[in-house]
Regions:
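Acidic active-site catalytic centers that drive phospho-/nucleotidyl reactions
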Residues: 8, 84, 162
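FAD-binding core/adjacent interface of flavoenzyme oxidoreductases
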Residues: 1-5, 60, 64-154, 184
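Short, conserved structural micro-motifs that define repeat-unit consensus positions
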Residues: 154-161
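Phosphate- and divalent-cation-binding pockets in alpha/beta enzyme and binding domains
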Residues: 15, 116, 138, 162-163
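Residue-level detector of alpha-helix initiation sites
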Residues: 11, 36, 112-114, 134, ...
């Protein structure tokens, strides 16, 4: 039987694999991730600064550890470029090489992408989106390089407010901008 394939190595993908393994330890599983497939709790990103957690302290396990723990193949840094549902086949690209991957069942656990605003100007290089551990690492590096402790957060939803609180606790002066009349307007 062909493997069950999970596209995405975020919280949903790893939780699905973990829960499925409890029910079926034998079925072949393959996880495909466009990034390094490091397992971490994404909510940690919005409060790690105040907790003095370096990016290296956040992961719960790298791809090799998770592969062994969940008895599944993990294809990291691999992009799905096509899905053929009739043939139950994926086209994958890794390091410029293309290959096919068959599946019995396919699960899309790709998460969400943040809205990236088209903002220009001489400070546009200082705009960071923090949606992954890789993004968080780059954000922390940029904060460490700057003498200026001012930070502007676009979005006063739960994550934006958590980031604002986290940054304030670490000595940053934070301004939160949102279209809503008040913070947490959608809750």
């Amino acid at each position: 039987m062909h493997p069950i394939v999970i596209i995405g190595s975020g919280m949903a993908g790893y939780t699905l694999a973990r829960e499925f393994r409890k029910l079926n330890p034998e079925q072949a599983l393959v996880m495909i991730s466009a990034d390094d497939a490091v397992n971490y709790a994404k909510p940690t990103l919005s409060n790690a600064l105040a907790g003095n957690k370096a990016p290296e302290q956040i992961p719960l396990g790298d791809a090799a550890k998770m592969s062994a723990q969940l008895s599944m193949d993990i294809l990291s840094d691999t992009v799905v470029t096509a899905i053929d549902p009739d043939q139950h086949e994926l086209t994958l690209e890794h390091n410029g090489q293309t290959r096919q991957q068959v599946y019995s069942k396919l699960i899309l656990a790709v998460g969400a992408n943040p809205i990236r605003l088209a903002i220009g100007g001489d400070a546009s290089d200082d705009i960071h989106v923090v949606n992954s551990l890789i993004d968080y690492r780059a954000f922390r590096e940029r904060l460490a390089e700057r003498d200026d402790k001012r930070v502007v957060i676009l979005g006063a939803g739960l994550i934006g407010c958590e980031f604002a609180n986290d940054l304030q606790h670490t000595g940053h002066h934070v301004t939160v901008i949102d279209l809503s009349a008040r913070p947490l307007g959608r809750l």
